[in-house]
């Protein structure tokens, strides 16, 4: 009977995830909270633990990134990236994903990659290279950048005391593993993609669309050049302010002894890494707005802030529903599943893979 009830609960959870995915945006969070309501009030499961630190890190990093966008810093970085990529157009399949990866590695969020994708597509098209080659790798590279980013919520969650932090694994360890691993993975993926499909000059379908005016490469190139020519004299200062925040996070992550210490109840405690990221990135946002002379309203209305807040609401509902389901049925999973996962650890990675597909998120 217990197994049937848990399977029924799992069906409800998966159904609500699917509905949220179809609705999109904050629908993830909304339908996730519907799941929490059903599990708590319908099945009397205790509410799970909210990922407060992850949510607050997303808020702080997205606020800093949105301030950077409002100050023109993001456009400045995109312009610099475009200049670099245009100097190496025939290597766009390799350099496009690597630049995207570097953007997300520094920014701590994949939402900053949106501005790069049209440029990568245009440069690939003008070089007669199938845009799908660099774009398919670039979208994956954005997520890989998050895994090794010192300011991403994913990294902070990994090194928290609930996960690897309890095993004395810190920011330095995660970066030493994830950065080289993701870099090599991108190179391998780009090498494979370099042989996918025909070049555009040999593709009859592409040539047909150009002849019929469905695709106009010259017009697309002109639009990109106009967008890249827009400059803001304060943008460079905003970029340096953002990079200063990232550098401070890396410094405090690599050298925990530099973080402030407090005596609470006769015990010495060190400022945690999630709190360090939250404080520094919010302070960086203030500095960016100051030196970049940005309008706060523009930061809130920007694409980065909107996408980031959607992600936070989604995590609010989905993560709470997932933790409520698993923690509420923990004895069952420990009895029936823990042994299998212990014997075959790769099954956990497979489960994460399919859940990420359903959630459209890492």
What are these regions (language model features)?
Residues 160-164, 260-269, 334-340:
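Membrane-interfacial helical/loop segments at transmembrane boundaries in membrane proteins
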Residues 121-217, 223-238:
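Membrane-core helix-loop-helix motifs of multi-pass transport proteins
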Residues 16, 100-103, 145, 181-189, ...:
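Alpha-helical transmembrane segments of multipass membrane proteins
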């Amino acid at each position: 009977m217990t197994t049937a009830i848990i399977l029924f609960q799992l069906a409800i959870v998966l159904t609500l995830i699917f509905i949220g995915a179809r609705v999109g945006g904050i629908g993830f969070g909304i339908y996730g909270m519907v799941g929490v309501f059903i599990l708590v009030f319908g099945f009397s499961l205790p509410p799970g633990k909210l990922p407060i630190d992850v949510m607050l890190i997303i808020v702080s990093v997205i606020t800093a990134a949105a301030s950077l966008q409002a100050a023109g810093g993001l456009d400045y970085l995109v312009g610099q990236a475009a200049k670099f990529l245009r100097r190496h157009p025939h290597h766009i399949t390799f350099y496009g994903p690597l630049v995207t990866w570097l953007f997300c590695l520094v920014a701590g969020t994949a939402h900053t990659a949106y501005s790069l994708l049209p440029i990568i597509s245009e440069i690939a098209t003008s070089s007669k290279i199938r845009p799908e080659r660099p774009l398919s790798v670039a979208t994956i590279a954005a997520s890989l950048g998050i895994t090794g980013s010192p300011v991403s919520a994913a990294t902070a969650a990994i090194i928290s005391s609930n996960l690897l932090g309890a095993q004395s694994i810190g920011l330095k360890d995660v970066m030493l593993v994830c950065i080289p691993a993701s870099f090599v993975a991108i190179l391998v993926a780009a090498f494979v993609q370099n042989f996918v499909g025909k070049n555009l000059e040999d593709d009859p379908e592409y040539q047909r669309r150009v002849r019929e005016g469905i695709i106009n490469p010259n017009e697309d190139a002109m639009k990109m050049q106009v967008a890249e020519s827009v400059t803001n004299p304060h943008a460079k200062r905003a970029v340096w302010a953002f990079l200063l925040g990232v550098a401070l996070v890396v410094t405090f992550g690599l050298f925990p002894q530099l973080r402030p210490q407090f005596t609470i109840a006769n015990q010495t405690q060190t400022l945690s890494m999630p709190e360090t990221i939250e404080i520094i990135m919010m302070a960086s946002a203030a500095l960016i707005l100051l030196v970049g002379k940005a309008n706060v309203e523009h930061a809130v209305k920007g694409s980065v802030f909107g996408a980031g807040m959607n992600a936070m609401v989604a995590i609010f509902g989905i993560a709470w529903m997932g933790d409520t389901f698993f923690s509420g049925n923990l004895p069952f999973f420990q009895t029936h599943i823990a042994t299998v996962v212990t014997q075959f650890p790769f099954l956990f990675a497979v489960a994460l893979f399919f859940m990420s597909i359903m959630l459209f998120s890492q």
